[in-house]
């Protein structure tokens, strides 16, 4: 956990980077990324003075089988929906704050509002935004779910984290679709994670379909090759993030024919519910072709 003060010039550099990214069309069809509130936190809470940023480790030491008959699901979605897990914890923290501060005004988010989570986490000292666009912690690598409490309390800020990617370019070199177009800049139009999770089209672009390498839900390539993850990843103590049965090594043939009923049963409390049955079938079928 860390704290970032909200200043009058509040995160101007991050807002400018976001504007440039959107102007280049790198958000693909994720129109919500252009919400003006994302560039000014006082649009979310006019009285905002501090952001309490939190990170929750979700790494589990389980490994995929490597069998080409199996699909690959990103680690973040192996277990229980992180929105539910972390929101419950933030709600408890916010309730405690309300008990300490009678006039508390606050909003809390877990990937649920127009807030630049990684930028605020960096300012709060949790880590730095790496060349692959993920927040990297010296203690846990990039296997962190992020959340924030925006509040009207004036709190002592933590030291913003410096950047420690150095000259490393492993993530850029490993991406099969060259989605990391330059250090720290990801073009969603080329990103496997974007297309398998957010793209609602009936058919994936050829450049994506030809390079899926088994991925059906997200993609961890740029994280798996990161030296910080290889050296410092630690098993989480949150049992909710242990893989559900069928999420670690799902059979491509099964996913290619998944029904609405099967989808409802398998992904009841999973972040994978964002990927509808038709999308899962599409992703699996593209891997089988």
Curated annotation (Swiss-Prot):
Subunit note: Monomer.
Keyword Electron transport applies: no
InterPro entries: 4Fe4S_Fe-S-bd (IPR017896), 4Fe4S_Fe_S_CS (IPR017900), QueG (IPR004453), QueG_DUF1730 (IPR013542)
Major site of localization recorded for this protein: cytoplasm
Gene3D superfamilies: 3.30.70.20
Pathway in which the depicted protein is active: tRNA modification; tRNA-queuosine biosynthesis
Family: Belongs to the QueG family.
Residues holding [4Fe-4S] cluster 2: 175, 191, 219, 222
Annotated disulfide bonds: none
Entry's cofactor comment: Binds 2 [4Fe-4S] clusters per monomer.
Species of the source: Synechocystis sp. (strain ATCC 27184 / PCC 6803 / Kazusa)
Positions contributing to [4Fe-4S] cluster 1 binding: 165, 168, 171, 226
Protein name per UniProt: Epoxyqueuosine reductase
EC number: 1.17.99.6
Single GO molecular function: metal ion binding
One GO process term, biological-process aspect: queuosine biosynthetic process
């Amino acid at each position: 956990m860390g704290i970032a003060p909200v200043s009058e010039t509040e995160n101007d550099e991050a807002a400018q980077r976001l504007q440039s990214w959107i102007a280049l069309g790198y958000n693909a069809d994720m129109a919500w990324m252009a919400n003006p509130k994302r560039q000014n936190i006082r649009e979310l809470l006019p009285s905002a003075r501090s952001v309490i940023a939190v990170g929750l480790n979700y790494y589990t030491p389980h490994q995929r089988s490597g069998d080409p008959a199996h699909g690959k699901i990103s680690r973040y979605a192996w277990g229980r929906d992180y929105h539910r897990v972390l929101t419950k914890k933030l709600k408890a923290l916010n309730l405690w704050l309300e008990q300490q501060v009678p006039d508390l005004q606050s909003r809390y988010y877990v990937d649920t509002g127009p807030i630049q989570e990684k930028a605020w986490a960096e300012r709060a000292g949790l880590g730095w935004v790496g060349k692959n666009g993920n927040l990297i912690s010296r203690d846990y690598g990039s296997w962190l779910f992020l959340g924030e409490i925006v509040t009207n309390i004036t709190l002592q800020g933590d030291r913003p984290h410096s950047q420690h990617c150095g000259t490393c370019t492993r993530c850029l070199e490993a991406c099969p679709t060259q989605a990391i177009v330059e250090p720290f800049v990801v073009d969603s139009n080329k990103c496997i994670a974007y297309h398998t999770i957010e793209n609602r089209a009936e058919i994936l672009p050829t450049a994506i379909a030809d390079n899926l390498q088994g991925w059906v839900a997200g993609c961890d390539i740029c994280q798996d090759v990161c030296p910080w993850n290889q050296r410092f990843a630690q098993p989480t103590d949150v049992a909710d993030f242990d893989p559900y049965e069928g999420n670690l090594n799902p059979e491509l043939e099964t996913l290619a024919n998944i029904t609405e009923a099967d989808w409802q049963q398998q992904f009841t409390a999973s972040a994978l519910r964002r990927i509808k049955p038709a999308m899962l079938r599409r992703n699996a079928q593209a891997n089988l072709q």
